[in-house]
Amino acid sequence: DNVTGVQTCALPIYKKKYKALVGEGSISGCKVILVKPHTYMNLSGDSLREVMDFYKEEFEHLLVIYDDIDIPTGSIRIRKNGSAGTHNGMRSIVRQLGTEEFPRIRIGIGRNSGDLADYVTGGFTKDEVKPLEEAVINAAYAVECMLDKGIDIAMSRYNMVYKLPKG
């Protein structure tokens, strides 16, 4: 949600289409379509498949941004491609598209020892909020950098590991 609100990537979401909320606009002079699936997470691929089919876009023009419990809170990992890992939404996307060959930005939300569903859908602690907000802002700048300078430069500038203070 928040990446679209960062000034560099401010795209209004104005349509309900393809089982998603959709916004269109421009970032760094490139036409961008933002798709926020409105399905259960494990069905995210259904929505994205419809969008890709309608716009007849190539997979290299796709960028998936998602939260990930498998990397530390506040960290960002940009990849050109790769497996879905443990993320059910990404598993759905890979299954529907039939490929892992598309770029993605993972925003780390870390993991806690409680119930996973409660953790992922619940709120974050006071110590987690600031690094997560910074990670979202950096992810937005990474999108702009990818469009301006390419994914390799974005990876070298924005792939980072954030360490929460021990407390």
Residues covered by each model-derived region:
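Single conserved hydrophobic/aromatic residue that forms the stacking wall/gate
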Residues: 1-9
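Catalytic-core elements of nucleic-acid end-processing and repair enzymes
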Residues: 67
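Short secondary-structure boundary/capping segments
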Residues: 14, 24-25, 54, 94, ...
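N-terminal catalytic or cofactor-binding beta/alpha core of small enzyme domains
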Residues: 10-43
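Short phosphate-binding loop-to-helix
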Residues: 31-63, 83-86
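Short acidic/glycine-rich loop or secondary-structure boundary segments that cap or lie
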Residues: 43-44, 71-74
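A short, glycine/Asx- and small/polar-enriched loop/turn
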Residues: 27-32, 72-73, 115-116
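Phosphate-binding/catalytic loops
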Residues: 74-86, 90-167
